Amino acid sequence: MLEKELLAREIEKIAGQENVKLDEPMKNHTSFKVGGPADILVTPVSVSQLSQILKLCKNKSVPVFVMGNGTNLIVRDKGIRGVVVKIFDNLNQFTVKDDIITAYAGILLSRVSTIAYENGLTGLEFACGIPGTLGGAVAMNAGAYGGEMKDVVVETEYMDKDGEIRVVRDDGHQFGYRTSFIQKNSGIVIKTSMKLKKGNKEEIKALMDDLTQRRQEKQPLEMPSAGSIFKRPEGYFAGKLIEDCGLRGHRIGGAEVSQKHCGFIVNTGDAKAKDILDLIEYIRNTVKMKFGVDMQTEVRIVGEV
């Protein structure tokens, strides 16, 4: 029996056979619909299972990659060696007390935005169309339309690389543009508390509807993508720079600069991760040559080179 099969058996004892997959194609777990196989993919159903899996992998010196629902992720075509831990809808419980929502990392951020509205709480309207999980959103300080997670997050329970639970509060998060203390230290968000404000439900709903409509009009939501590919360069808009380079609709293989929004790359149906990565590099080089601006990716790129 192969070493990875033996490891998979051990992980099955922790998380259950139904939650462990061998040689799982990562294209089934990313919004871009690309990516080679993960040696082992596990979806833990509790914090205790997550901790046990991390400790097991550490003891065996097996690399671990933790993901949410794969909406901000490019996995290379050769896939991911070691263990991929997917924290999604198995860890999605939440509570609401007065003006504070506390929720586990696997819940969708858009769902948390809806929960806020249902409870007459304002502050998370910006998040209504962000497709990722709460955990990923907190780790990278996700934001849109003038709002960011740093505006509402007051406390986060996270797990360090050793499987131990830690807590950060307020400024301890060290939020920056698309980054945080937790991300910099490879922490795994377990649950987060967000402090909101009492608001008018009709006004909250109206703003959410407006932002949703703007997204639908301006973003290629009907095609596989990973949202905004690039961080916003200081003083510029990434999409505008790409458009001004004449790259709207530019294709490499099955990857295309979106006709609808130049800040997005879409999978036209048969893209490989290599097509997307080659297109990213082409865009970066073109923008650098024309405008002298360095474009940094917002999307996570992982997997065997």
Swiss-Prot record:
Give the positions the UniProt entry annotates as the active site: 178, 228, 298
Q: Tell me the protein family, please.
A: Belongs to the MurB family.
EC number(s) from the headed UniProt entry: 1.3.1.98
Q: Which organism is it from?
A: Acetivibrio thermocellus (strain ATCC 27405 / DSM 1237 / JCM 9322 / NBRC 103400 / NCIMB 10682 / NRRL B-4536 / VPI 7372)
Q: Which SUPFAM superfamilies match?
A: FAD-binding/transporter-associated domain-like (SSF56176), Uridine diphospho-N-Acetylenolpyruvylglucosamine reductase, MurB, C-terminal domain (SSF56194)
Q: Which GO terms describe its cellular component?
A: cytosol
Name recorded for this polypeptide: UDP-N-acetylenolpyruvoylglucosamine reductase
Name the pathway. Answer: Cell wall biogenesis; peptidoglycan biosynthesis
User: What does this protein's UniProt record list under function?
Assistant: Cell wall formation.
